[in-house]
């Protein structure tokens, strides 16, 4: 089956829905394809305890706020309900179960192939998300470990781990919250942390930390970090006393230079201070019977490891190598990316900014010169 449209959006998560809404507002005909059988599929697959680490006021998509009564930090299920409402509000009906296999530019037109369907469009907006393909460390000994080894994308809750020794590898925002969840379900938890990091509180003086980040975003990153540092240190404390190493640069500089976000602490550090979560070094290798060898040569035995080791976009599956960089001139030849930039002002807020810009740029290119 062949379909023709002005703009094709790939992905029906927050970024794809936001782009669809903005295109709808601008009167641009579009279609959305999604490989899963539902919108917001990645959110539906997240662990049960997940809440937004950014507040609802700065996390709504364009033109529609979260419903009244939603708590400051919405739960996974509340975000899913919001995405469903968002799609219905803007009349967005994606083509579901459409795995995009190839996107090619031919004679000034984008040809997108998905199974037996071919989409021809003037513009393509890739909105498949930064967290598409789980990253799994290639540690020696994985084949003989003999214990449960799962990625955070496969983790649901800590019920099955009660009374067990569980290692969470990685201390990003997923790793920090999963460690809390395991503790709350009665597991004995340790964190494997190799890299230095920044830790920021979720709130400062009762205000969401994102509000401060947005206020400081117009300043040079190092100056913004210098202004925020005293408050952050006052609230977070000295993480070196917990066996953690602080990055030499502040959190805003970290995001701008590495595209990696700091840990937004929602209670992990308190559990470390209370001795309920141990902090260990990086993992060197796995061994028989659940043995884990760490960078310092020490060996400990665990019943399970949760890999909170991140994701990669996986765009090479359907984009030619020269198109995968997500760099260059935005909208060049009609190709756009939404939801891949890590912003100090919040991922969902950034998606909204990008979606508006993309829609406006498409409209401007359609006007007579």
Where are these regions (language model features)?
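Flavin (primarily FAD) cofactor-binding/catalytic cores of flavoenzymes
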Residues: 2-36, 40-42, 71-173, 177-207, ...
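Redox-cofactor-proximal catalytic regions of oxidoreductases
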Residues: 38-65, 93
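A short acidic, helix-capping loop that chelates divalent metal ions and anchors anionic groups
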Residues: 65-71
